């Protein structure tokens, strides 16, 4: 992937200027020696937000979610506290650190290589993002990004701040534009549509979902129709029934892997206008409409448990669960053979009661925080998620080979999407 001209001396310099100016502003506002320090800033915010010394503290941490929640009600905060929280939010914009990573990783021809690691995700075998971490780029919503780019390349910090206000946010939106195609080419982006919903329905044999994807493809409307008994033709803009689409959407995205109300909340159900009281009903209705998918969770868990208990292979839904080992090296694995032939591995598995008092599969995994081997446990829904994402990954792998066979260059890909550095006359990838 190639960088735009002016990246190093424009974008890179602007990050340092932006950070320093915000830090100077915070020091001037608070009088603190290091306003980036949580130990210094939390007491300052608490003391300046109280009308009386006995009032409760405003906050006890400066996590992203905490700052965001406080700023949603900034009308109730003193002006200096609100201003400092906004500065903190801008200073904490981790996405602009990607510019530093870009500069570090840049190689010959202003290109960055090695952005994905093959089989980087241990459980599913998916590619993992490396270096610049392009798998979680911030979205851009500014309509005048080209003008913002010119200001940055000219190192015009004051102009950028005067026109756009939040400089770190503007810089983060420009990250995508720092990557450009090769000379005479353009980026062509293609993605799978609702790939995980398709795979789990196919694997479980949820026929009505398969029929939706084979015809109109409106899975959110169709799900709402199944859940609430409303004709799908009524769930269109302008009709009161259209409000049900949101419930169908959040349920489809959140509940496929045995999740409940907490999964709906994590998917943003409350922020999308749903109330906590109606969430259990949504869970129940979705499960009633998707009995085959629910059955898949339990079939997967039972097959895995049986393989562990009997040391005999167990098959269900096109999957084969087995306990495998290597006597020479003393290794043992619970394996899951996918329909395509690839296997998933759960190292050093054993059975033990989980926190709910149920017999569950435990295995060793590298902790995301500790980066050390530690014991983890799993269940039917979680294993189903691993299996579905692994099958979707294999679909992507086949597609990458098909694209390469057509003489096109994939310069990056995410779990369900490919970015191709294509000649200007390429417009679509039908049949790939």
Regions found by a protein language model. Give the residues of each.
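Metal-dependent catalytic core segments for phosphate chemistry
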Residues: 145-146, 196-230, 345-378
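Short, amphipathic alpha-helical "recognition" segments used to contact nucleic acids or chromatin
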Residues: 247-257
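Short beta-strand-to-loop capping motifs
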Residues: 420-424
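Active-site palm subdomain of RNA-directed nucleic acid polymerases
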Residues: 395-418
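Short, conserved charged micro-motifs
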Residues: 24, 425-431
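C-terminal segments
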Residues: 1-28
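Conserved "right-hand" nucleotidyltransferase catalytic core of DNA-directed polymerases
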Residues: 26-171, 180, 186, 193-196, ...
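Conserved pre-motif C helix in the palm subdomain of viral-like polymerases
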Residues: 193, 380-401
